[in-house]
Amino acid sequence: MSKKILIVDDEPNIVISLEFLMKKEGFAIAVASDGEEALAKVASFEPDLILLDVMMPKKSGFEVCEALRADPSKAGLLIVMLTAKGRDTEVAKGLAIGADAYVTKPFSTKDLVVKLKTMLGVA
């Protein structure tokens, strides 16, 4: 059974390219364009990993991460934060609230695939 990834970003071009790339790698994919939709998709799609943009409408990636980490049933869910703000304080905040990894935009798609496969144990 293929691993499931939820892509959460409000930039359509990023969503389209990530969705294409991850499907090509054999992952099952769902997408959400804001934080509220992300939380609903986690409940219905039950992903193994979330690629979560930090800056989004309705709920930020930080708020989504905090909500998921507060839910014991989501303890095994891997969260990778995506951001254009690569400042140390942003990275530290993301990791402190429970993100498993942090990727700064722009990123190498090849490196991202390697990172996700390693995290999901399918490398």
Model-flagged regions — what are they?
Residues 31-49:
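Acidic, metal-coordinating helix/loop segments flanking the phosphotransfer/catalytic sites
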Residues 107-117:
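C-terminal output helix
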Residues 32-33, 58-59, 68, 97:
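Hydrophobic residue at a beta-alpha junction
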Residues 15, 56-58, 87, 105-106:
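The feature encodes the CheY-like receiver
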Residues 12-30, 119:
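Two-component/phosphorelay signaling modules centered on CheY-like receiver
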